[in-house]
């Protein structure tokens, strides 16, 4: 049965009950008839002195929501149609509607109640105005709409191994099954002793200094712990240095915590290593910390020791805390060795994040951790804040914690994937070579993780809007990717794809991608 969302609107002294499906159909029909894109509507709204965001427009077009009355009037004005027709279809497309005297049956009592009650609207918090998370954003919403209509979408937008046939090691599943009866209650808010002990030993092998059990925290994935640590550290207006491109959760969490994310550049011409000169130039008296993502998402770059030592020197000179996102540290290829930056900074406050989601192909289990190391005296108050927030969420997923010790010990099956002949290794090589064969596309070879971040010749393809490019690719080839802007990259010239699908699927998708770029020119 069709689900209808009703709003009360007063146009020309008439109450109109609006069907959500009707509105999005009318909007898409009008835009198609007038050959108008979403980006055209957004630009037109700016010319009229109004603000209409990409996410808003995408949700209206996909039928996820209906705009407020003032926004509906703005859309009608831009598209030169009658607002009542656009919303409810009661009037001619190009004419203002007038009241009708058609006799109608008496409405059901519940409808009378709905029309007589004016319910206030609830808007999202203004704290979300500058938050971006396009890994699951408007283009993904459009893909979901297409799937609902029966389209088959190839999802190359997210590093989720399980749907592509990567299986959890049998020993891990067996261990969780055996321990489930003992996992029914809360654990210590920091995590199970066995899990934290295994994490401490792993951290010591990585060379992290001054690691203590009480400064290890398990979480429902690294994502929860990033948000927790940002809330514990940042006051309103505090600045934190974050790479560009970045994993967008860092920028989002810093913003939600009241901080101001400042992006330093990673240099594509230097294997996507951080530009240390640019990093230091962005530091002000308000800068509190810096973030590195190593191995990097979305570029797959693995930072060498000398680059990390340079970052440590910058942090030391300016007395900054270091946050290191190292979730892909066990997925390095081509002989590249991961060096934990905390191992180079025993005198600095460091927070290191890792987990099992990627290395053990168990993203759905939601198990990550963070380790506070180095100079803990200067972050004692921060640690109190972390403890407070950790206690407030009670504890992380206990069954997932129970398998950390097993997962970190013994044979690491991930190594079979990333060596020559391994599935991840070979698929990475294929995608890298196939992309470089496409005229107008260039790409730096990723050395770790699941992602590749190609560059498009924007002049050749006439690309000015990378979200529109992602939508065009989705509509024509049914391929879902993430635009470069979703990773806080300023130019509309990059996109990220995941090389997790099986080889035969990747071959088909890269052929489709080559065919798309062979003729694509953004209008």
Positions of predicted regions on the chain:
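Conserved glycine-rich beta-strand-loop-beta hairpin in the small C-terminal domain of fold type I
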Residues: 405, 421-432, 443-457, 491
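Conserved PLP-anchoring active-site segment centered on the Schiff-base-forming lysine
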Residues: 232-254
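A short, Lys/Arg-rich alpha-helix, primarily the initiator
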Residues: 1-45, 107
